[in-house]
Amino acid sequence: MAAVVQNVVKLLGEQYYRDAMEQCHNYNARLCAERSVRLPFLDSQTGVAQSNCYIWMEKRHRGPGLAAGQLYSYPARRWRKKRRAHPPEDPRLSFPSIKPDTDQTLKKEGLISQDGSSLEALLRTDPLEKRSLPDPRMDDDSLGEFPVTNSRARKRILEPDDFLDDLDDEDYEEDTPKRRGKGKAKGKGVGGARKKLDAAILEDRDKPYACDNSYKQKHSLKPPDRVCGKRYKNRPGLSYHYAHSHLAEEEGDDKDDSQPPTPVSQRSEEQKSKKGPDGLALPNNYCDFCLGDSKINKKTGQPEELVSCSDCGRSGHPSCLQFTPVMMAAVKTYRWQCIECKCCNICGTSENDDQLLFCDDCDRGYHMYCLTPPMSEPPEGSWSCHLCLDLLKEKASIYQNQNNS
């Protein structure tokens, strides 16, 4: 190292090297000053309590170099552990005051010396009026004001500025052992069973979402006509279904309040007439993506047929849905569902939607664990279900993807 320094000094010059060292020192001083504002602190990444130390020296500490190649030398300082005074005892934990007759008895028995010993000092306490509870805000530094009552000479309690590196990792740890895992053992029982029951009730209520026409039952004095029973995997689908299926009925009921009630048979026929063929929801006449209709697609400007969901009635242009020509022909052959209402074609449920795998030829949904054989991860590229493989043969998307690759 000394040879390297000598080579640098010879190459750049001693004055240039000194200036570079001064600039480096000034930069480090500014950096350390900024860091010292936040000291001490607990490093969240390493979990180590960062405190000040003796690494950083001042200019006044410099001395001449002692070895070859040394420009400066600094005095070595011995590491010293900070002395901690015992905190004042809580008066509530002290011994009760002793009556005079008891004091005389103890002196006779020899428990208390006549000249006053440490035992007498421990047994004697002040009245409760003169006691004051210790301030919890006191730290170890403020304990220097308390006198030392033992026979030893009084020692000065050092301040943090005297020893900057006294704070170490152990200072931030508690000395008392912690009892883990025992405090909450008694909480199990009725409370735990009640929490499990509440969680089960919430899960049954919200997952999956069922349409029971609750708005009409809560805010209308008339008895409910029927319960819809439609189920959805999330709230947006249920809200959309309610807005397009039941809200119009409630508005119609508000208008007909002044008219005599219609028979139940006629009312049920009117409700059935609002449903499409095979009990399907009436489709919307506009696209949810571009807000166009079958006469014009606002993205392309061309007329395009709408594809509607059989459960909620949402509609969309095939180009807005990014359908392929094969998929456009396939969705007309079965009860197509939008992404909000999509269910597994095998088990018929919409749970675990993160496990749903969609066919690239017909847009049907399948749980990966419902397939035969089951799949653990979605395949790369296109995927075709067994129905499309039997129908399209080699024209299926899975084979087209393999041919292109």
Curated annotation (Swiss-Prot):
List the PHD-type ZnF regions, as residue ranges: 284-344, 341-391
Tell me the domain of life.
Eukaryota
State the compartments where it is located: Cytoplasm; Nucleus
* Keyword match Zinc: yes
Pfam hit, one: DPF1-3_N
Stated role: May be a transcription factor required for the apoptosis response following survival factor withdrawal from myeloid cells. Might also have a role in the development and maturation of lymphoid cells.
Could you say which protein family the record assigns here?
Belongs to the requiem/DPF family.
Q: What is this protein called?
A: Zinc finger protein ubi-d4
Q: Which gene encodes it?
A: REQ
